[in-house]
Amino acid sequence: MSKTHLTTDKFAQMGLEPEVLAGLESKGFHYCTPIQALSLPLLVEGHDLAGQAQTGTGKTLAFLAATFNYLLTHPLTKPRLINQPRAIIMAPTRELAVQIYNDAESMSASTGLKLGLAYGGEGYDKQLAVLEQGVDILIGTTGRIIDYFKSKVIDLSNIQVVVLDEADRMFDLGFIKDIRFLFRRMPPATERLSMLFSATLSLRVQELAYEHMNHPEHVQIEPEQMTGVRIKEELFYPSNEDKMLLLLSLMEEEWPEKAIVFANTKHVCEDVHAWLENDGHRVGLLTGDVPQKKRMKILEDFTKGTVDILVATDVAARGLHIPDVTHVFNYDLPDDAEDYVHRIGRTGRAGKSGHSISLACEDYAFNLPAIEEYIHHPIPVSKYDREALLDDVTAPKRVFRNRQPVNRNMRDRQGGGNSNNRRRPPRKS
């Protein structure tokens, strides 16, 4: 794996406690990413921090290392009840909360500090049993944390560290009232270490930092381009009739090792999933109403490689760290220009290259000007030969459509792709 995304700064130079370093090094982390190198010296000194960094820059490891380090170096000066965690880490989604928890386990093992997890959708009693035993660091979503707080399962009056991850996403999802409710139940900002991370430090995020933090230092990690220099962007203008066949043809030509296909609605995601599955791809579906256990299993399968393609709404566009994604397909151009950046940011991470392919169809092409204005450059356009799209595709039985795909010959972009009408064999299960 390329190390070009790392700095020459080592975690051992950051002033971290030996137990924290042991947890990092047990997972092979020795050198810092830019956000870690900039933020950890400030956090170790006890400064609050508001950091701007995209997902995949190493910010999770930065705030986890700082949290564990602070708790080790600042023992409580008064007795703590068993229902009083010492640190709280808030995330916008269940998947991100679970991911943070998993990333924290190595430092938990090396420091002896106990972790708790709280998120909605499932596992209330199981999570409750852990919390009732007492935890040092509580990681979770705001809604479930408030449920436990109102039930007096947890008490926030002894919080020493608070982390708010993906703050901009919290606003998007309408969780800011919950966040303010929780902040007001904690000790004042001058009596705790506070960290906020966000992909964008918008005015509303800065106001939140000003309101609930103690003169935070601002750290900003700007990509060389809004969309990342390692991501090859490509745009097609298909008709609505050609759109699905073009996606299938591109899948056949690119044959991605690991791809995410984004669509704007649940129903379109289900449609795309059915077509891809019917065409022999190993594909998973991730939308907002997929049951939690199934969501976690799909993400696990996708991460392990037993599923090659994930079809998703924007529920997966932010927060989740899914390594080694080679391709992102925007089947629908997003309505929010910022979501375009978050979507294609799933690839081209950790020093690797990636490929983003967007379809500007009749329904969503009008979103393109705002996207290109936001990213400060036009997306390169590729043409396709509609006579060269796949001609051996049939609609899946469970998808009801007014028209059937028109038989066409071959599938390439101006001469590329497989020759002699050969199809790749279906992916092996």
Curated annotation (Swiss-Prot):
Biological process terms in GO annotation = RNA catabolic process
- The record places domain Helicase C-terminal at 243-390
Looking at the keywords, is Nucleotide-binding present? yes
Cite the residue spans of the region called Disordered. Answer: 399-429
Q: Which UniProt keywords apply?
A: ATP-binding, Cytoplasm, Helicase, Hydrolase, Nucleotide-binding, RNA-binding
Please provide, alphabetically and separated by semicolons, the GO molecular function terms listed in this UniProt record.
Answer: ATP binding; ATP hydrolysis activity; RNA binding; RNA helicase activity
Q: Which reaction does it catalyse?
A: ATP + H2O = ADP + phosphate + H(+)
Going by the entry's taxonomy, the superkingdom of the source organism is recorded as Bacteria
PROSITE patterns given in the database record: DEAD_ATP_HELICASE, HELICASE_ATP_BIND_1, HELICASE_CTER, Q_MOTIF
Entry's localization field: Cytoplasm
State the GO CC annotations.
cytosol
Q: Tell me, in a sentence or two, what this protein's role is.
A: DEAD-box RNA helicase involved in RNA degradation. Has RNA-dependent ATPase activity and unwinds double-stranded RNA.
Q: Which HAMAP family match?
A: DEAD_helicase_RhlB
Q: State the similarity comment.
A: Belongs to the DEAD box helicase family. RhlB subfamily.
Q: Which NCBIfam families match?
A: PRK04837.1
Instruction: Give the protein's recorded name.
Output: ATP-dependent RNA helicase RhlB
Name its species.
Aeromonas hydrophila subsp. hydrophila (strain ATCC 7966 / DSM 30187 / BCRC 13018 / CCUG 14551 / JCM 1027 / KCTC 2358 / NCIMB 9240 / NCTC 8049)
Its lineage reads: Bacteria, Pseudomonadati, Pseudomonadota, Gammaproteobacteria, Aeromonadales
Gene that this sequence comes from: rhlB
